Amino acid sequence: MELVLKDAQSALTVSETTFGRDFNEALVHQVVVAYAAGARQGTRAQKTRAEVTGSGKKPWRQKGTGRARAGSVKSPIWRSGGVTFAAKSQDHSQKVNKKMYRGALKSILSELVRQDRLIVVEQFSLEAPKTKLLAEKLKDMALEDVLIITGELEENLFLAARNLYKVDVRDAAGIDPVSLIAFDKVVMTADAVKQVEEMLA
């Protein structure tokens, strides 16, 4: 199959298996959920009554004081006591094998092509790391919410995009399923397309 280059009067021949396969919604959902789960820190930690600092001695005798009975200063109902169901550090990551991950990326890229959300250009670069230059370039292309993918990371482009809302720049090796579906449009250079094809082959 062929993808038309927007900034040149030519087309780029690409693999049908990468850019023309059927959309597998279940697979994409599983991989996106796993990717998001892997990004969770999971570092929360609270102390149970067994872990809180304090004496194990009964605060006062059981009967005769007129006060409510108490067996420990570490009780969850006391101030500074332990937490009843204390949250602990957790690894939320889910296993996704390489074949599934690559399959999901191919499904997403193919769907972007079908929905006319993937724009392929010969090259995408800036003369200087100026946000204004990038903003004007995107305005000329009628793009706002966009992910730009280049073969190698363009430093000028990366620096210029940092201050633009809903604009992100990646190199071909840095693509992920969540980023690909998060933006309205995806702009890829011809080099990036070839690199992604090799990566997913």
Swiss-Prot record:
GO terms for cellular component: ribonucleoprotein complex; ribosome. It comes from the Bacteria. Keywords: Ribonucleoprotein, Ribosomal protein, RNA-binding, rRNA-binding. One of its GO terms (molecular function) is rRNA binding. One of its GO terms (biological process) is translation. InterPro entries: Ribosomal_uL4 (IPR002136), Ribosomal_uL4-like (IPR013005), Ribosomal_uL4_dom_sf (IPR023574). Coiled coil: none annotated. Residues 51-73 are annotated as: Disordered. Belongs to the universal ribosomal protein uL4 family. Part of the 50S ribosomal subunit. NCBIfam families: rplD_bact (TIGR03953). One of the primary rRNA binding proteins, this protein initially binds near the 5'-end of the 23S rRNA. It is important during the early stages of 50S assembly. It makes multiple contacts with different domains of the 23S rRNA in the assembled 50S subunit and ribosome. This is Large ribosomal subunit protein uL4. The gene is rplD.
